[in-house]
């Protein structure tokens, strides 16, 4: 997919220069809409023709806070009428132990997006496996919350189990996550990749710092952040065929498309 707009909210002066110093956002974007060009299509995203608007809300260590996420949501509200925006993928989440006031701020923000007609897909977080560990704002009854199942009987990922996904019930006794998708050992784009052609113009000293540069275009990562764009990409494909669907109708279609799997204590099943 193409990146139509970008905004970085992690510094005191918001930047519009496209960059990713943590790798999280690039990996998520690749799962959703990567072209797979470097791998001859092998590692293409779920919906490779999808256009992207990207908010950077995590710093170079992959950490974030409520304020940067809220700034990102405010930006979406400001630009949503300038683009054909249907979906919002939120592959971040606050701890279930957030103070009530901060929880409310996040929940109100994502539910406002939903009430405006946008389909909001969020991760359930990696705070499991105990009950009541869904990350905020995944506890919202309106948004689509994505988790990773404890077992993946249909796939061979090299991981026999994944026992990290946040799970319900929520504080209001709502079952969550809504849907499950693969999120363990997912291969997608590496933000530190530099091609052989690019390397010719890079200072040799940088190659002594493998933390910053890599010759590998793809990398495997694990988490509900990786499962969330799988679901978002599937809904993007749905909208490409049925562009007039509402977010409620899309949620119902998703519900009816899930396959129940063993080991899942709640939710609709595996997409």
Summary of predicted features, one role per range:
Residues 1-7, 16-67, 81-87, 115, ...:
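Subtilisin-like serine protease catalytic core
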Residues 39, 71-74, 164-165:
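Alpha-helical scaffolding within the catalytic cores
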Residues 270-271:
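Short helix- or helix-capping micro-motifs
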């Amino acid at each position: 997919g193409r990146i139509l707009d970008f905004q970085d909210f992690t510094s005191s002066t918001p930047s519009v220069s496209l960059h990713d110093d943590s790798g999280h956002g690039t990996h998520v974007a690749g799962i959703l809409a990567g072209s797979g060009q470097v791998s001859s299509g092998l590692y293409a995203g779920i919906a490779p023709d999808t256009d992207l608007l990207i908010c950077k809300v995590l710093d170079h260590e992959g950490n974030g806070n409520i304020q940067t996420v809220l700034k990102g949501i405010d930006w979406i509200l400001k630009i949503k009428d300038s683009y054909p925006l249907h979906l919002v993928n939120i592959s971040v989440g606050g701890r279930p132990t957030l103070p009530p006031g901060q929880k409310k701020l996040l929940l109100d923000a994502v539910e406002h997006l939903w009430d405006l007609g946008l389909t909001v897909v969020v991760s359930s977080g990696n705070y499991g496996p105990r009950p009541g560990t869904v990350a905020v704002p995944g506890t919202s009854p309106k948004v689509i919350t994505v988790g990773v199942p404890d077992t993946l009987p249909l796939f061979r990922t090299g991981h026999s189990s994944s026992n990290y996904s946040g799970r319900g019930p929520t504080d209001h006794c709502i079952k969550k996550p809504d849907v499950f998708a693969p999120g363990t050992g997912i291969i997608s784009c590496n933000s530190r990749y530099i091609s052989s052609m690019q390397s010719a113009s890079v200072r040799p000293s940088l190659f002594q710092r493998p933390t910053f540069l890599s010759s590998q275009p793809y990398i495997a990562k694990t988490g509900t952040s990786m499962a969330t764009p799988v679901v978002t990409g599937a809904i993007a494909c749905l909208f490409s065929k049925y562009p007039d669907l509402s977010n409620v109708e899309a949620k119902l279609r998703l519900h009816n498309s899930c396959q129940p799997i063993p080991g899942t204590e709640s939710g609709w099943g595996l997409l």
